[in-house]
Design a protein with these regions (language model features):
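Walker A (P-loop) phosphate-binding loop of P-loop NTPases
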Residues: 12
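Hydrophobic positions on the alpha1 helix immediately C-terminal to the Walker A/P-loop
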Residues: 18
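ATP-dependent NMP and nucleoside kinases share a basic, alpha-helical "lid"
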Residues: 85-162
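Residue-level signal for inorganic ion chemistry
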Residues: 34, 81, 110, 124, ...
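Hydrophobic anchor at the beta1->P-loop junction of P-loop NTPases
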Residues: 7
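Small-molecule kinase domains that catalyze NTP-dependent phosphoryl transfer to phosphate-bearing small molecules
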Residues: 69, 114-120, 132-133, 137, ...
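N-terminal phosphate/diphosphate-binding loop that engages ATP/GTP or pyrophosphate donors
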Residues: 25-90
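Conserved lysine of the Walker
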Residues: 15
Length: 221
């Protein structure tokens, strides 16, 4: 049985970057559930399935096999055998990940795979409902957040560094829309687990936040 750390929080809070750093420091496996949803979002997008047709999204998701492999320390995400690691980081695929994540059949499709990985390894898993639904018995639970404006600022800088010219206002509006969708969906809405540590990173560097995660993990072992 692995030692499991669950990190939940809203879009753009830096969960992935912080979890990755902490996992490296602890020599744990980092499981990016968001990347799994992005991969399915990409597949649904390619198939031109309407966003509002949840039945079709659920059926289309069943055609996918998503896996994560680490090659020379770098994470690679595979969709039906194709490496989609770069393509899933695009902004419109982030939007699609939020759409498919609200569909029960999609969540069910990924749940067993995520739990199996956690059972067999020491892991840090981040997402929207890890501590509340996927790993309710995780050894450490953290709710990691930052203000919507700070999250939009970070995301805007990241997009600019990749040559993406999406305006800040559009990024902020998208983050607020995703917050609303994630907290109001019927299945596993985003919320802090009762036994989770609340960690606001608005005024922290990524390194400071990762160090806090490592500290919490070591205290719990």
């Amino acid at each position: 049985m692995g030692f499991n750390i669950a990190i939940d929080g809203p879009a753009g809070a830096g969960k992935s970057t912080i979890a990755k750093l902490a996992a490296s420091e602890l020599s744990y496996i980092y499981v990016d559930t968001g990347a799994m949803y992005r991969a399915i979002g990409l597949y649904v997008y390619r198939k031109h399935v309407p966003e509002e047709d949840t039945n079709a999204i659920g059926e289309t998701a069943k055609e996918t096999e998503v896996s994560i492999r680490y090659i020379d320390g770098e994470r690679h995400v595979y969709l039906n055998g194709e490496d989609v690691s770069e393509e899933i980081r695009k902004e419109h695929i982030g939007h699609m990940a939020s759409v498919v994540g609200a569909v029960p059949d999609v969540r069910e499709h990924l749940l067993s795979l995520q739990r199996q990985i956690a059972q067999e390894n020491d892991i840090i898993m981040d997402g929207r409902d890890i501590g509340t639904c996927i790993l309710p018995n995780a050894d450490v639970k953290i709710f990691l957040t930052a203000s919507a404006e700070e999250r939009a600022r970070r995301r805007h800088l990241e997009l600019q560094s990749k040559g993406d010219t999406t305006p800040y206002d559009v990024v902020l509006a998208d983050i607020k829309e995703r917050d609303y969708r994630d907290t109001h969906r019927d299945i596993a809405p985003l919320k802090q687990a009762d036994d989770a540590v609340y960690l606001d990173t608005s005024n922290m560097t990524i390194e400071e936040a990762a160090a806090k995660v490592v500290e919490l993990a070591k205290a719990a072992r």
